[in-house]
C-alpha cells in the first residue's frame, strides 16, 4: 500500500483533523464531532462537515433546505457554540521528512478512566485541542440537484444515510435533521497559540478538478472514526477503495468508512495527494440493507462555492479566499483527464420487460448476462451502453440455461454492433488474492451508469481441477447480476457475476461475499457460437456434472458429510 500511496498518505495525514462542538460550560470533546480537512495551518483554516452544527442553528435545520440557501454566515449559530480542532503536528524529523507515527496512547482520553501514566509513546503526541470559530456554512447546489435525482421521489423511503445501524432507534426528527444537513459543510477559523503559529506549515494542497478522476481509479480516505472519541487511536485513519460512480459533484466510493469520518478528505494517487472530495455520509442503507458505498461531495465545486460565499462576507473574512487550495492545473504537469481502465466501460444494461440487470459484450453483437435477467429464449431484450455515449440496441435471447442448471447464464444476439464498447480478453488462469473489480448497474440502474467496486479474488472453487466458481470481496448489489468481473492487473475478463449472499434465516444480505461463473467455463461454447451459430456447446452447460451442482447449491459433497456419532 505504501508503495502506491506513499506521497498521498503523507498529504492525507497532514491534512486530516478532528472537529468537536459543545455548548458553553460543557467538556471540549462534546457530543457532536466529525472529521475535517486542514486548508491552512497558519493562519488556521479548516473545512469540515456541517451536520454537527444542526443543534446550534438559531432558525433550526429547516433553514438548510430553504429556497436559495447556498451558504449561511457564522452568526447563524447560537452564541453558546464552542468549537475545537485537533490535529497532528507536521514537525520535520531528523532526516528532514515529516515523521509518521500513531500518537502515544493515554487511556483517560479514550474511556473516562482514572488518570494514570500514559503508555510508552509509539509516535508523536497529538496537538492540544485548539479553539475555533465558525466562519460560514456552505453547500454545493449541484450536489443537491443530483442527490434529489438519484435518491428522491419514490425511492426516498428506501434510502437512509444515518450513521446509526438499521436496528438503532433514531427519531424521525433526528433523521430529518441529518438528511437536511447531508450536503452542508463548514469553514472554520482556528485560533492558534504562538507555538502553533511557528510550526511548519507543511506542503500545499491542490484540488482535483471535477471529472478528472475516472471510475475505477483508486482513492484514499482519511478520517477519524467516531470523531472525538479516542483520537489517540482513531485520528487520521486511512481507508482505500475506488471511485465507484459519479453524478456531477456527487461521488460514490466503496472505501469502507465509519461514523465520525464525515468531512474527511478523499485523495487520489495521481497526482499524488490531490484532494478529490469530502465524505458526506459514510454509511448508506437501502431497504434496510447496508449498501457498502460511501457518499462524497467533490471538492472542486465545493471550494468554488466557498470562494463565492467568502467574497460576499466582510473584507476581513473575504481575504481568507486566497488560502483556499487551487485546482490541479498546468503547474502539476499532468493531464486534467484520465480515461481510466478500459474495462470500466465494458458493462451494459440489459432490460427484459420490467426486469433489468447487467451484461458484458463478448463480441460486437453478442452479450452475456444471467438467466434470471433474461429467462426465456427468443425473448426480445434492450441492451443499453452508457460509455462513451448512450446507445440502445434491441436483441434476442438465443440461449438461456435451464432452471435446474447451476450456471445462471443467458446469451443475447444483437441486431447491431455495440460500437465503442471494449471487448474484453477472456482470462485463462485465476490467482487467489489478486486485485479484481466488478462493473455493473447495481443499486441505480441506468440513472447513474455502471458502478465499479473493488476487492480481491477470495476463492477459486474447483471440481476435478477445473474452476467452477469464483468468490470475491467486491461489493455486489441487486442489478449487478450478469456484469463482468475483471483482473485489475491484466484487465482480462475473469467471470460473470451471478449473485451476492443472503442469509435466509435473518434476511441479511452480504454484498461483499458473491459468486461468479469463471469465463473458462463459458469461453469455448461462446467462441463456437460466435463463429458457427451452433448452440451445441452452450447446451452442454445444462448437463453439468453433479459435483458442480453441489457446489452451486452451497452443499457439502456427500463423501465429506459428517458422520453420525450415534
From Swiss-Prot:
Q: Where is this site: Cleavage?
A: 110-111
Short name of any one Pfam family annotated for the protein: Trypsin_2
Annotated GO CC locations = cytosol; membrane; peroxisomal matrix; peroxisome
Any single biological process term in GO: protein processing
Instruction: State the InterPro entries in the record.
Output: Pept_S1A_Tysnd1, Peptidase_S1_PA, TYSND1/DEG15
Q: What is its EC number?
A: 3.4.21.-
Q: Which UniProt keywords apply?
A: Hydrolase, Peroxisome, Protease, Serine protease
Question: Any keyword Amino-acid biosynthesis?
Answer: no
Q: Where is this region: Serine protease?
A: 319-531
Lineage: superkingdom? Eukaryota
Tell me the leader sequence span.
Answer: none
Report if keyword Protease is assigned.
yes
Its subcellular locations are:
Peroxisome
Q: Mind telling me how this protein is modified after translation?
A: Self-cleavage gives rise to an N-terminal 15-kDa fragment and C-terminal 45-kDa fragment upon import into the peroxisomes. The full-lengh TYSND1 is the active the proteolytic processing of PTS1- and PTS2-proteins and in self-cleavage, and intermolecular self-cleavage of TYSND1 down-regulates its protease activity.
> What do we know about how this protein assembles, alone or with others?
Homodimer. Forms a heterodimer with the C-terminal cleavage product (45 kDa form). Forms a heterodimer with the N-terminal cleavage product (15 kDa form). Interacts with PEX5. Interacts with LONP2.
According to UniProt, the name of this protein is Peroxisomal leader peptide-processing protease
Q: Which gene encodes it?
A: TYSND1
Amino acid at each position: 500500500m505504501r508503495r502506491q500511496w506513499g506521497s498521498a498518505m503523507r498529504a492525507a495525514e497532514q491534512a486530516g483533523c478532528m472537529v468537536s462542538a459543545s455548548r458553553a460550560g460543557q467538556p471540549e470533546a462534546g457530543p457532536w464531532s466529525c472529521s475535517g480537512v486542514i486548508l491552512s495551518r497558519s493562519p488556521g483554516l479548516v473545512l469540515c462537515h456541517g451536520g454537527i452544527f444542526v443543534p446550534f442553528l438559531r432558525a433550526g435545520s429547516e433553514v438548510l433546505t430553504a429556497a436559495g440557501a447556498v451558504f449561511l454566515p457564522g452568526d447563524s449559530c447560537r452564541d453558546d457554540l464552542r468549537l475545537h480542532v485537533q490535529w497532528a503536528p507536521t514537525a520535520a524529523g531528523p532526516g528532514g521528512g515529516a515523521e509518521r507515527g500513531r500518537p502515544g496512547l493515554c487511556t483517560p482520553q479514550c474511556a473516562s478512566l482514572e488518570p494514570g501514566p500514559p503508555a510508552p509513546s509509539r509516535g508523536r503526541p497529538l496537538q492540544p485541542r485548539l479553539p475555533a470559530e465558525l466562519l460560514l456554512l456552505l453547500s454545493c447546489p449541484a450536489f443537491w440537484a443530483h442527490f434529489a435525482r438519484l435518491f428522491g421521489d419514490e425511492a426516498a423511503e428506501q434510502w437512509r444515510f444515518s450513521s446509526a445501524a438499521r436496528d438503532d432507534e433514531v427519531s424521525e426528527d433526528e433523521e430529518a435533521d441529518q438528511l437536511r444537513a447531508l450536503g452542508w459543510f463548514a469553514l472554520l477559523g482556528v485560533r492558534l497559540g504562538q507555538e502553533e503559529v511557528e510550526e511548519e506549515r507543511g506542503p500545499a494542497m491542490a484540488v482535483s478538478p471535477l471529472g478528472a478522476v475516472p471510475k475505477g481509479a483508486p482513492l484514499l480516505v482519511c478520517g477519524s472514526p467516531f470523531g472525538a472519541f479516542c483520537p489517540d487511536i482513531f485520528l487520521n485513519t486511512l481507508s482505500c477503495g475506488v471511485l465507484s460512480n459519479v453524478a456531477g459533484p456527487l461521488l460514490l466510493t466503496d472505501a469502507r468508512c465509519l461514523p465520525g469520518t464525515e468531512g474527511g478528505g478523499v485523495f487520489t494517487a495521481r497526482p499524488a495527494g490531490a484532494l478529490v472530495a469530502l465524505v458526506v455520509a459514510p454509511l448508506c442503507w437501502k431497504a434496510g440493507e447496508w449498501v457498502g458505498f460511501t457518499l462524497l461531495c467533490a471538492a472542486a465545486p465545493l471550494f468554488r462555492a466557498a470562494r463565492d460565499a467568502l467574497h460576499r462576507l466582510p473584507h476581513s473574512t473575504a481575504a481568507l479566499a486566497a488560502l483556499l487550495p487551487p485546482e490541479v492545473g498546468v503547474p502539476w504537469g499532468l493531464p486534467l483527464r484520465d480515461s481510466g481502465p478500459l474495462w470500466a466501460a465494458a458493462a451494459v444494461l440489459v432490460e427484459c420487460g420490467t426486469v433489468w440487470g447487467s451484461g458484458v459484450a463478448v463480441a460486437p453483437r453478442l452479450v452475456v448476462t444471467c438467466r434470471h435477467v433474461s429467462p426465456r429464449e427468443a425473448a426480445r431484450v434492450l441492451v443499453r451502453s452508457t460509455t462513451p455515449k448512450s446507445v440502445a440496441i434491441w436483441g434476442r435471447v438465443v440461449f438461456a440455461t435451464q432452471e435446474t442448471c447451476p450456471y445462471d447464464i443467458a446469451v443475447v444476439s444483437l441486431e447491431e454492433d455495440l460500437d465503442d464498447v471494449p471487448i474484453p480478453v477472456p482470462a485463462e488462469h485465476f490467482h487467489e488474492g489478486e486485485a479484481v473489480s466488478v462493473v455493473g448497474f447495481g443499486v441505480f440502474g441506468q440513472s447513474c451508469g455502471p458502478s465499479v467496486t473493488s476487492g480481491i479474488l477470495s476463492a477459486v472453487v474447483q471440481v476435478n481441477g477445473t474452476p467452477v466458481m469464483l468468490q470475491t470481496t467486491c461489493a455486489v448489489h441487486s442489478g449487478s447480476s450478469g456484469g463482468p468481473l475483471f483482473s485489475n492487473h491484466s484487465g482480462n475478463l475473469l467471470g460473470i457475476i451471478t449473485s451476492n449472499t443472503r442469509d435466509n434465516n435473518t434476511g441479511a444480505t452480504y454484498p461483499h461475499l458473491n459468486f461468479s461463473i469463471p469465463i473458462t467455463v463459458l469461453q469455448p461454447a461462446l467462441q463456437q457460437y460466435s463463429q458457427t451459430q451452433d448452440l451445441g456447446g452452450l447446451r452442454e452447460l445444462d448437463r453439468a456434472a453433479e459435483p458442480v451442482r453441489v457446489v452451486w447449491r452451497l452443499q457439502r459433497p456427500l463423501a465429506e458429510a459428517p458422520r453420525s456419532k450415534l
